[in-house]
Amino acid sequence: MNVKVRKFPYPFKCALSISSDIDNASSLDSFVQFMDFLNSENQTIYGPGLGLEVGNSFWFFNGSQSFQLSYFEGLTNKETLLAPIIRTYLQSKHIDTLHSWGNFDKGGFKRSYANKGMEVLNKYNFNVPVWVNHGINLNYQKIGDYPNMYGDDQNHSC
């Protein structure tokens, strides 16, 4: 008998993974509507929902000059209206990506921001399995072996 393990469960021959990204989400309402469109079959402003299982990302802080949805208001510890929604999506696993600790397009990242983010994750017992690591060069919290990536350098001030 010749038994083999298939790459994909029968009857499937391939797979596709889709992840949305909070970058430039225009408003709290549009973010929620888009998540509903992707993950339900409800009628949405985008049309009937697709009924998929699509994850998304979030930031704890917004240190950029542009409007960005985040857990905290700007660089403060004050929760936004999105914070409880983020917690709901983290609990349901519809948010599975930490878009680094925040958008720091103006620079200014400090380890205290990461500590505050960890406080929230620990308080609610959330595990975020994916880390998004992109951003302009002033986002020093990025991790890697390229210039301006200091997130894993314990000797750097960020």
Regions found by a protein language model. Give the residues of each.
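Catalytic alpha-helical scaffold of carbohydrate-active enzymes acting on polysaccharides/glycoconjugates
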Residues: 1-158
